């Protein structure tokens, strides 16, 4: 029997990735793996991941606080608190924090594939080559496990 999940403000699993911290709030175990949810906090004046696209999951970003800069393909959008960005499979995207305050995003994945991606990156960062962190090739291999690739081109274009 699947039980409910209530995660308090200090709960969840924390994954630190450079200037960002991901707090996993729902890893899919309560939702039959239909939905994963994380809270991403990005340091001021920080970029996010390289622009990339997913083949097998939708991704949502709700701006809780701060202002996000979303780039989708060639278009960029400054998104203040209260903005929702939904990214379908095949759409290249990234985000950044251009502001002076931390950016907090509520991040959803349907299905929950990307929760394990964050865990895999954490493990890789712990075994990366010195202070330089993991290589681009190693990160690319992890991305490919989750049908994700670095690109700024829409799938099918």
Task: Go through each PLM region and give its residues.
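Acidic/histidine-enriched, glycine/proline-rich intrinsically disordered or flexible terminal extensions
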Residues: 119-157
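Glycine- and acidic-residue-biased ligand/ion/polar-headgroup-sensing regions
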Residues: 56-68, 73, 82
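A short glycine-rich, His/Asp/Glu-containing loop-to-beta-strand
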Residues: 12-51, 57-58, 108
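Conserved GNAT-family N-acetyltransferase fold
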Residues: 40, 61, 85
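Basic/polar N-terminal segments that are highly enriched at the extreme N-terminus
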Residues: 1-10, 154-157
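Short beta-strand segments
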Residues: 49-51, 72-77
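Short acidic-glycine-tyrosine-enriched beta hairpin
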Residues: 7-8, 74-92
């Amino acid at each position: 029997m699947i039980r409910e999940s209530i995660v308090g403000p200090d709960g969840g699993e924390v994954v630190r990735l450079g200037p960002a911290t991901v707090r996993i709030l729902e890893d899919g175990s309560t939702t039959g793996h239909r939905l994963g949810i994380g809270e991403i906090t990005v340091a001021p004046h920080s970029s996010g991941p390289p622009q990339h696209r997913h083949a097998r999951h939708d991704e949502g970003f709700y701006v809780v606080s701060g202002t996000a800069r979303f780039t989708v393909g060639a278009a960029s959008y400054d998104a203040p608190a209260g903005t929702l960005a939904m990214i379908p499979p095949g759409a290249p995207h990234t985000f950044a924090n251009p502001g002076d305050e931390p950016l907090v995003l509520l991040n959803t994945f349907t299905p929950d594939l990307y929760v394990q991606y964050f865990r895999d990156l954490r493990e890789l960062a712990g075994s990366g080559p010195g202070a330089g962190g993991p290589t681009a090739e190693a990160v690319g291999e992890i991305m490919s496990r989750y049908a994700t690739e670095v690109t700024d081109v829409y799938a099918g274009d």
